[in-house]
Amino acid sequence: MNQERVFKVLLGPHVSEKATVLADKKGQFVFKVATDATKLEIKKAVESLFSVKVERVTTLNVLGKSKRTARGLGKRNDWKKAVISLQPGQDLDFSSSAE
């Protein structure tokens, strides 16, 4: 996988109450990813960007909500979420990768 694709696969961390509990208790981290990204691409992107070993990648497609607007019904965009499980002894630190 080329370097350009690595940066397009991971769109950013997904911060929610459930994602925080997963990170604290199980060592799993949640990312927003490109909708066309595969599990293998996500695994390689996380391993190359954060220098960690990934044990498992679980993905799910999140459907956008229907919202009412002044012009009728609208719909938010669908997006893809990936839950990354790291191998035992590994930890992912977002602050050190930004420096």
From Swiss-Prot:
It holds the Pfam family Ribosomal_L23. One of its GO terms (biological process) is translation. InterPro entries: Nucleotide-bd_a/b_plait_sf, Ribosomal_uL23-like, Ribosomal_uL23/eL15/eS24_sf. Keywords: Ribonucleoprotein, Ribosomal protein, RNA-binding, rRNA-binding. The keyword Ribonucleoprotein applies. GO terms for molecular function: rRNA binding; structural constituent of ribosome. PANTHER family: 60S RIBOSOMAL PROTEIN L23A. Part of the 50S ribosomal subunit. Contacts protein L29, and trigger factor when it is bound to the ribosome. One of the early assembly proteins it binds 23S rRNA. One of the proteins that surrounds the polypeptide exit tunnel on the outside of the ribosome. Forms the main docking site for trigger factor binding to the ribosome. Belongs to the universal ribosomal protein uL23 family. HAMAP family: Ribosomal_uL23_B. This is Large ribosomal subunit protein uL23. It comes from Pseudomonas syringae pv. tomato (strain ATCC BAA-871 / DC3000). The lineage of its organism: Bacteria, Pseudomonadati, Pseudomonadota, Gammaproteobacteria, Pseudomonadales. The gene is rplW.
